[in-house]
UniProtKB/Swiss-Prot annotation:
Pathway: Amino-acid biosynthesis; L-tryptophan biosynthesis; L-tryptophan from chorismate: step 4/5. It comes from Polaromonas sp. (strain JS666 / ATCC BAA-500). NCBIfam families: PRK00278.1-2 (NF001370), PRK00278.1-6 (NF001373), PRK00278.2-4 (NF001377). SUPFAM superfamilies: Ribulose-phoshate binding barrel (SSF51366). The gene is trpC. It catalyses: 1-(2-carboxyphenylamino)-1-deoxy-D-ribulose 5-phosphate + H(+) = (1S,2R)-1-C-(indol-3-yl)glycerol 3-phosphate + CO2 + H2O. This is Indole-3-glycerol phosphate synthase. Gene3D superfamilies: Aldolase class I. GO terms for biological process: L-tryptophan biosynthetic process. It is an enzyme of class 4 (lyase).
């Protein structure tokens, strides 16, 4: 595991400990189990692909550790609405505060402003966070293979499924992909960022593509910023994309989405 992930996970453990003091696990579990129906995250992606369109998970992201603030004029509801109007299949909302300046409130605001299913983008290491995700309205959670052992992944996936949430499992290399494929979720995200060097290359997705079984839905993540990138990936039969930074820097994120994917 990289140093940055070690640091992030330590912070998450402390955040969870503090959250449990404010709201005990039994309470958050009861809240999660009493929530209304989720939106179909996997179904939304498959519907776009069946229609011959790219399935875009559009990210609502204020900042990143490496780039700082991406968007000063940051209004999650407006961003989400624009994404929905311009062809996004789903949303991804950062809820990590310390490293990405995210917020639970951002997810709530984004989800309330449109009908799209929403991924809680955070570093999930504990069951408490899964219950929390359901309470805030998430329809899907992210499990990062680099942050978890196999038993943890399996347990968190089972809990998410029991709460009617989808799971996107994220990998960075072939060894992580092999571990991810032990899970039941159809959603496999390949992150194009090298966790050791932080360099980004679409070759990461293209090199692992053939090792993803046909019954899984591959989502390529990071480094997709030009129509040429999209063309290259779509020609390789990659149909689902998670994109944030390229949109966050644009005047209108939804318009930028339509332009990048040829949906305008």
């Amino acid at each position: 595991m990289s140093d940055i992930l070690d640091k992030i996970i330590a912070v998450k453990r402390e955040e969870i400990a503090q959250a449990i003091k404010r709201k005990p696990l039994a309470v958050v579990r009861e809240d999660a189990e009493s929530r209304v129906l989720t939106r179909d995250f996997v179904g939304a992606l498959r519907a776009k692909i069946s229609a011959g369109k790219p399935a875009v998970i559009a990210e609502v992201k204020k900042a990143s550790p490496s780039k700082g603030v991406l968007r000063a004029d940051f209004i999650p509801a407006d961003i989400a609405q624009s994404y929905a109007e311009h062809g996004a299949a789903c949303l991804s909302v950062l809820t990590d505060r310390q490293f990405f300046q995210g917020s639970v409130d951002y997810l709530k605001q984004a989800r309330a402003s449109c009908a799209l299913p929403v991924l809680r983008k955070d570093f999930m290491v504990d069951a408490y966070q899964v219950y929390e995700a359901r309470v805030m309205g998430a329809d899907c959670i992210l499990l990062i293979v680099a942050c978890l052992d196999d038993a943890q992944m399996k347990a968190l996936e089972a809990l998410a499924f029991s709460l009617d949430m989808a799971v996107l499992v994220e990998v960075h290399d072939e060894a992580e992909l092999e571990r991810a494929l032990k899970l039941r979720t159809p959603l496999v995200g390949i992150n194009n960022r090298n966790l050791k060097t932080f360099e980004v290359s679409l070759d990461n997705t293209l090199s692992l593509l053939g090792k993803v079984p046909a019954d899984r839905l591959l989502v390529t993540e990071s480094g997709i910023s030009t129509p040429a990138d999209v063309k290259r990936l779509r020609e390789a039969r990659v149909n689902a994309f998670l994109v944030g930074e390229a949109f966050m820097r644009a005047e209108d994120p939804g318009v930028a989405l339509a332009q990048l994917f040829g949906l305008d």
